[in-house]
């Protein structure tokens, strides 16, 4: 199973990147073929401009992936601008793919913010979402480490379900 994990936050201390790395580790342990893309290393331009080399590479990776996991931070109860640019410019080949969401937010009241990403993926490309979302807040981290055992268990369960369902959808 070829899984693309997109960490979309541009923050130097991105907590959603930590979630992506934790899921990557879990899926690698299950012998999945993982490509992790860190948006911090992807120069981007808006949809009306020519794509950068890195954006063209991401478009190819989306096309080649069997499924996709998207890591996002919350900004004003929605997806961040970098994720929106990457969705608008690089996801045309995502139609019908299975996907999952990892979300890091500053506070507990942002838990519905992932619904905007769900609407985009389901309405634009008819993607199929894993019904489990990993949602974390600042209290789940100590500096740059996931400190919550509950969050680690949710990551493990998300990864197990993503692996099992993703493989079933391939057969």
What does each model-identified segment do?
Residues 1-90, 147-171:
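N-terminal beta1-alpha1-beta2 submodule of the flavodoxin-like/Rossmannoid cofactor-binding fold
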Residues 99-138, 150-153:
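Short, glycine-/small-residue-rich phosphate/pyrophosphate-handling segment
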Residues 87, 119, 140, 144-147:
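Juxtamembrane helix-loop transition sites at the ends of transmembrane segments
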Residues 42-45, 137-143:
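A short acidic, often aromatic-flanked loop/helix-cap motif at beta-alpha or helix-coil junctions
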Residues 95-96:
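His-Asp phosphorelay/catalytic-motif detector in bacterial-type signaling
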Residues 85-92, 119-124:
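A glycine- and small-aliphatic-rich helix-loop capping segment at beta-alpha/alpha-beta transitions
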